[in-house]
Amino acid sequence: MTEKLKQGIDQLGLKVAETIQQSMLAFLAFLQKWNQAYNLTAITEIKSMITHHLLDSLSILPYLKGDKILDVGSGAGFPGIPLAFACPEKKFTLIDSKAKKTAFLLQAASRFKITNVTIIQERVGSYQPGFYFDTITCRALGSVREIMEQTNHLLRSGGQWLIMKGAYPEKELRGTDASAIVHVLNVPGLKAERHLVEVKNNKG
């Protein structure tokens, strides 16, 4: 499994220290254990988790900007946890409305000493942190427009949304911000289509 992750990271053109890669794999084993009782993810094998969770999450790393990142609907921690592992200099806030998921994330952050993450259990529309984020990430949670509307109050002017999608979201992009750019993501070992919708916040 170590070699599979290393090869995948190399294919993505990223540099992640081996110690960090080992922590990522340990996190997956921890998730697998919790998943038996709490059903946090439908993907249960470590090999598949590496592809569908770790490498999929890390594929958006080149597009990450700023120091304050909000991961919306973080669930079992994707893409927030892998990104936090890879970018210890950035501050990540992971928000989810479900108690069992935030409980897992709190335990994981403590166990693996992920000191650059803050875990919040709340609906994102009600979240008022008192500051703005530079980037908002989201995977598998609602349409592009819905995500933008629910989180607009949290993103600074000039900041960006990075919304992860499967197939090209043509219908979702109709009527949304004209500054949307869609990147094709090539995730090593993943045959399914993956796209990243990047939208800049042009509010004054």
Swiss-Prot record:
Coiled coil: none annotated. Its EC number is 2.1.1.170. It catalyses: guanosine(527) in 16S rRNA + S-adenosyl-L-methionine = N(7)-methylguanosine(527) in 16S rRNA + S-adenosyl-L-homocysteine. It is found in: Cytoplasm. Pfam families: GidB. S-adenosyl-L-methionine binds at residues 73, 78, 139. One of its GO terms (cellular component) is cytosol. Keywords: Cytoplasm, Methyltransferase, rRNA processing, S-adenosyl-L-methionine, Transferase. The keyword Transferase applies. One of its GO terms (molecular function) is rRNA (guanine-N7-)-methyltransferase activity. The keyword Cytoplasm applies. Belongs to the methyltransferase superfamily. RNA methyltransferase RsmG family. Specifically methylates the N7 position of guanine in position 527 of 16S rRNA. NCBIfam families: rsmG_gidB. This is Ribosomal RNA small subunit methyltransferase G. It comes from Coxiella burnetii (strain RSA 493 / Nine Mile phase I). The gene is rsmG.
